[in-house]
From Swiss-Prot:
PANTHER family: HEAT SHOCK PROTEIN 70KDA. Keywords: ATP-binding, Chaperone, Nucleotide-binding. This is Chaperone protein HscA homolog. Chaperone involved in the maturation of iron-sulfur cluster-containing proteins. Has a low intrinsic ATPase activity which is markedly stimulated by HscB. The gene is hscA. It comes from the Bacteria.
Amino acid sequence: MALLQIAEPGQSAAPHQHRLAVGIDLGTTNSLVAAVRSGVPETLKDDKGRSILPSIVHYGEESLLVGHEARELAQQDPSNTIFSVKRMMGRSLADIQQRYPHLPYQFEASDNGLPQLMTPTGKVNPVQVSAEILKTLNARAVATLGGDLEGVVITVPAYFDDAQRAGTKDAAKLANLNVLRLLNEPTAAAIAYGLDSGQEGVIAVYDLGGGTFDISVLRLSKGVFEVLATGGDSALGGDDFDHLLADWIKEQAGYIGDLTAQQMRMVQDAATDAKIALTDADTAQIDVLNWQGIVTREQFNALIQPLVKKTLMSCRRAIKDSGIEISDTIETVMVGGSTRVPLVREMVGNYFGKEPLTSIDPDKVVAIGASIQADILVGNKPDSDMLLLDVIPLSLGIETMGGMIEKIIPRNTTIPVARAQEFTTFKDGQTAMSVHVVQGEREMVSDCRSLARFTLRGIPAMTAGAAHIRVTYQVDADGLLSVTAMEKSSNVQSSIQVKPSYGLSDNEVATMIRESMTHAQDDKDARTLAEQYVEADRVLEGLITALAIDGDTLLSKEERETLEGVMMELVQLRKGTDYRSIEQGIKKTDKASQEFASRRMDKSIRQALAGQSIDEV
C-alpha cells in the first residue's frame, strides 16, 4: 500500500531513494517513535538510551520540559505538570471535568467550550501539549536518522472520533510533521506481528496501557483489517494497579489522614517501582516516607485481580458485539506496558484459550507497526511488495441497464476520494435495486472486473424514474472502497466494503488499460448499441403499461392498432445489431405515441382539478 510517484504501469518513476519516515505511538502514558532501518523496524532511543518518552509536559516560569525531565518535577509542581493529555483530546471542558474530577490542573474554557490549561507561560490547550510531545519525538528521529522526515504515521485508538483524530492531526501540524496516515492502534499491533500477510481470520488485540484499556476485535480478510467491535474502559489502566498498591502501602505504613500532593506522588512512584519489580520477581522491597516493607506477587495479584476481571468483562462484550465466538479468534495480541504483569497474561490466555502473542515488547509493538506502515507509504519497500494506491489504478463504476458501466471514480484519481451519483428505477413499482460494483476501463460489464454485488431493498413503490437512489463511492487512504446506496425519500440504505487492489498485479492493471485502448472503437460501438437497446426497452415498457391503463378509453381501435404496429416494428429492430436503425425506430415510436401521451396528460390534469373552483386553482 505504498504511496508511489504516479506513473503508468510499465513506466519508471523517479529513481528510487530511501525516504525517512517514522511511526509514532502517541500514548496516554508513554510515547515512542520507531523507524525501519536496514529492513528492520526498531524504536529510536534518546541520548541516554531510552526508547520510552513519558507523555508528560512541564510548564515552568522559564522552561518547558517534556518526558523524563518533566516527570521528575511532578512531585514538586503537580499543577503545572501535564499527564495523560490524550484523555483530553477532542473533549469539551465540561466533559473532562465530569470524567476526571480530580485533575490537579487549573482549567479555563475557551470561547467554544474547549479546555485551556493555565500555566506559568500562559494558556495552553491539549493540542498544544500533544504537539510538544511530538516535537520531542521528531527531534529524536531527526538526530538518530540524520535527516528531515518525509512523513509520519501516528497511531490512535480505534474508537477515536473525528474530533479526536482531527486534534491529533492538528498537534502534528503544530509540530511541523507531515502525517501520512492516522493508523488504528490495534491494526498497528497486528501489522507488527505480520498478521496482515497471508493470514485470514479474527484477531483480538488486548491493549492495557497506563491510563486506558482497549479491546479490539479485528477480522483480517484479503489484506484488509475490518474492525468488528471495540470496547474497553477509558479510566482503567496500569495506573490503577499503582493506585491500589499505593493504598496498600499507606495502610501497611499506618498513614492516617491526607498526604500532601508531593507525599502522594512519592508513594505512587514507590508503588510503580514495586509493580515493575514484581514482573520478574516474587517479592519487591519498598522504602518510602520512612517506611520499609516487602510486597509479594501473590499479594499484588490479590489487589489487582478484580480489575483484570473487569477487562475480561469488556472482552466478553466486544466478542458478543462482533457476533463471533471466542473460539473463532486465531490470535490474541498483547499491547501496552501493563500487559507485562504476569497475572494479566495468565488470565487473558485462559480467557481466549490460547497463549497470547508477547514476543514483541508490548510497549513498543504499536510504534513498530506504525513504522512498518510509514516505510511502505513513502515507497521504501521493493516494487513487488507494493500496490499503486496513491491513485485509483483502474476506474470504479456501477453496472447500469444493458450491461453497461457508469464510471463513478475515473482511474488516476488521487485518494482518498468520495464521489456520488444519482440513479433511478427502471420499472413501475420497483422496490429493490441490485448494485454491481465493477472495475475497469472498458464500456461493458462483461469486459471488466466484478468487485462486489449487493441489493438495496425497501424502495417505496413509485412509477419508473420517480425514485432517487444516491450511490456513493468512497475510497479511503488505505485503498478500501465503501459503496453506499440510499433512496432519498425514505433514507433506506445498504452498503458494502471491498479492496479494489487486492489480488491485482501491476501487469494485470497494465493489460486492462492497454485493452481499453485497443478496443476503444469496438467498445464505443457496443455501448452505443446497448444504450439504444435500453432506450427501446424503456419506450416499449412505458407504452405497454400506458396502453393497458388507457388504451381502450383514449384511443380508437384503428389508432391503437396503428400504434401497436409501430411498436412491433421497434421490437423487431431491437433484435438486430444496427444501432442506427433502432434509434430511428425509437424516434418513429415516439412520434406515433405523441397524441396518445397528450391525451393521457389532459386526463391527468382533469382528474387533478376535479371538484376544485377557479379560486382554489
